[in-house]
């Protein structure tokens, strides 16, 4: 299946800026107020391409350098975890041609960029379901996870074939199997137990979710982990984003009053 697009040009439309190239530009955020975990819904690639008379796949290509500029900006700001909504379980509804491109492009990006991420101290993580996902994509993700497993600067989670409801359903199914096998009691299921069965239970809850393109919905992204996250809906299409947009959202977050249901 993955061989169908072997002759497709998967190169990006631009070259990303290197991290730490201009330290004077980095905002001086209070270290104790920077969100520990940020999730980004990378939306608007297709519209960006359409506005320029290009095909949708060109929008995805234009997004590649922005992804890594965003990662660089997160490192500079002191963010510890960054989850990127790369391909959802609902994205299989797109045209077969676009799905094939996205699968091949995801595989090639991980393969092409893993050395760079390793040099930056990125620990690559993957969150999502295995069924339907190309084996070649899984192989690249697992190889990148293995190569970078000891890195500690930032964990970057590529959410590929990910759906929040699917993640919760999978966690409940795993708990049900443990109940069936007599490992736990069915009447003692807790929130912590569900959290412990999510795809990456060691990653803390999401503090800030950013969605690009002006759309104001979360689209099944981290519903459990982002239950108390601050939301920032930015107008820019994703290929027009980068570290400056990320920093602006972090600044918005820092100036919000988080109460978690309580009163101050």
Curated annotation (Swiss-Prot):
The keyword Ubl conjugation does not apply. It comes from Bifidobacterium longum (strain NCC 2705). Catalyzes the condensation of isopentenyl diphosphate (IPP) with allylic pyrophosphates generating different type of terpenoids. The active site is at residues 43, 91. PROSITE patterns: UPP_SYNTHASE. The gene is uppS. SUPFAM superfamilies: Undecaprenyl diphosphate synthase. Substrate binds at residues 44-48, 56, 60, 88-90, 92, 94, 211, 217-219. The keyword GTP-binding does not apply. It holds the Pfam family Prenyltransf. Its EC number is 2.5.1.-. Its cofactor is Mg(2+). This is Isoprenyl transferase. Binds 2 magnesium ions per subunit. The lineage of its organism: Bacteria, Bacillati, Actinomycetota, Actinomycetes, Bifidobacteriales. GO terms for molecular function: ditrans,polycis-undecaprenyl-diphosphate synthase [(2E,6E)-farnesyl-diphosphate specific] activity; magnesium ion binding; manganese ion binding; Z-farnesyl diphosphate synthase activity.
């Amino acid at each position: 299946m993955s061989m169908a697009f072997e002759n497709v040009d998967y190169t990006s439309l631009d070259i990303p800026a290197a991290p730490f190239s201009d330290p004077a530009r980095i905002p001086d955020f209070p270290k104790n107020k920077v969100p520990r975990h940020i999730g980004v819904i990378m939306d608007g690639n297709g519209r960006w391409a359409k506005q320029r008379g290009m095909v949708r796949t060109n929008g995805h290509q234009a997004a590649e350098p922005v992804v890594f500029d965003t990662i660089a900006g997160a490192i500079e700001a002191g963010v510890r975890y960054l989850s990127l909504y790369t391909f959802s379980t609902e994205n299989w509804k797109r045209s077969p041609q676009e799905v094939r491109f996205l699968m091949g492009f995801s595989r090639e990006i991980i393969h092409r960029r893993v050395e760079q991420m390793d040099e930056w101290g990125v620990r690559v993580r993957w969150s999502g379901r295995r069924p339907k996902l190309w084996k070649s994509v899984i192989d690249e993700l697992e190889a990148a996870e293995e190569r970078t497993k000891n890195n500690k600067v930032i964990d970057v989670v590529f959410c590929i074939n990910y759906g929040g409801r699917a993640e919760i359903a999978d966690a409940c199914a795993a708990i049900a199997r443990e109940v069936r096998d007599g490992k736990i009691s069915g009447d003692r299921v807790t929130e912590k137990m569900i959290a412990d069965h999510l795809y990456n239970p060691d990653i803390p809850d999401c503090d800030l979710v950013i969605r690009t393109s002006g759309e104001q919905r979360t689209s099944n992204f981290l519903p459990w982990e982002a239950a108390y996250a601050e939301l920032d809906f930015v107008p820019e299409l994703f290929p027009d984003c980068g570290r400056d947009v990320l920093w602006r959202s972090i600044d918005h977050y820092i100036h919000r009053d988080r109460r978690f249901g309580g009163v101050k």
